[in-house]
């Protein structure tokens, strides 16, 4: 055996065969990765709140989790980890409803839909998820032209250049809702009330007050339909069955081996 453990296993479709083999163990946990349909809030027509709301209702999260991640992942309705005690479940606010999506597009002045770009980085959740989302958007009249990019291209065109309509990426930094307070960030969301809330949060030490602020922050970005909130990325690992002490969850992007040992 050349490999004894593989943290962050990239092929969820292969996990059942490992789980069925007594030589291996499969660990399924959670990450800090909010997987989102990132939306360029300054690029028409996504500068229109009604269009972003239509986009949200055009998306069937569970179909994406099932099709792209083979069932691994937790639906989210805002940019916050469901395992965090301050998480607010807002998934119902953007529930899948293709007829409502069509109605909202018509209200926004796009009864025939529109065309946009969907630029996808390499991870399978993005490539597979992108195909599923493109089909879901097509069903309500939105034609999303897919471009598959390598990471350097994605960083240049999308993250730095902001030359995109839509993209899919998992934001794996812990507790990073404060990125929505940066108007220059790649989804270009500019809300002074949210920015003030994040400043107040930074200056607040009382736990109850901070919790209330974080819940308000989640609600603001959900109400503004800044991005399409898809799912919390699952932590998937495969290891030799005799290994103990591996982390099931991934609270950071590190693979912690300090407690790892072999069973006798």
Each predicted region: which residue ranges?
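Short helices/loops that flank or line small-molecule/ion binding pockets
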Residues: 1-4, 16-21, 49-50, 131-140, ...
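Extracellular/periplasmic solute-recognition and catalytic clefts
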Residues: 1-43, 152, 170
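A local structural motif
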Residues: 2, 23, 111-118, 135-149
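Short, well-ordered beta-strand segments
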Residues: 6, 117-119, 167
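Structural transition elements
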Residues: 40, 46, 74-107, 125-128
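Short, hydrophobic beta-strand segments
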Residues: 40-42, 88-89, 112-121
């Amino acid at each position: 055996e050349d490999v004894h453990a593989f943290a962050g296993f990239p092929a969820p479709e292969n996990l059942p065969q490992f789980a069925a083999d007594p030589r291996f163990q499969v660990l399924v946990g959670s990450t800090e990765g909010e997987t989102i349909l990132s939306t360029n809030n300054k690029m028409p027509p996504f500068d229109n709140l009604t269009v972003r709301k239509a986009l949200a209702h055009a998306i069937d999260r569970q179909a994406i989790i099932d099709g792209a991640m083979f069932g691994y992942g937790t639906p989210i309705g805002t940019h916050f980890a469901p395992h965090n005690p301050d998480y607010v479940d807002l998934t119902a606010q953007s529930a899948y409803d293709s007829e409502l999506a069509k109605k909202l597009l018509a209200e926004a002045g796009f009864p025939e839909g529109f065309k946009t770009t969907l630029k996808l980085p390499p991870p399978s959740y993005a490539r597979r998820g992108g195909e599923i989302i493109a089909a879901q958007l097509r069903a309500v009249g939105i034609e999303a032209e897919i471009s598959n990019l390598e990471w350097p291209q994605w960083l240049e065109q999308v993250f730095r250049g902001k030359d995109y309509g839509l993209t899919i990426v998992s934001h794996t930094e812990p507790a990073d809702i404060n990125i929505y307070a940066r108007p220059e960030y790649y989804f270009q969301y500019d809300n002074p009330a949210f920015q003030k809330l994040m400043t107040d949060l930074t200056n607040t030490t009382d736990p109850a007050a901070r919790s209330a602020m974080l819940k308000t922050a989640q609600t603001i970005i959900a109400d503004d339909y800044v991005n399409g909130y898809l799912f919390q990325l699952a932590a998937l690992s495969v290891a030799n069955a005799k290994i103990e002490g591996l982390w099931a969850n991934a609270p950071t992007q590190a693979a912690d081996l300090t407690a790892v040992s072999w069973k006798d």
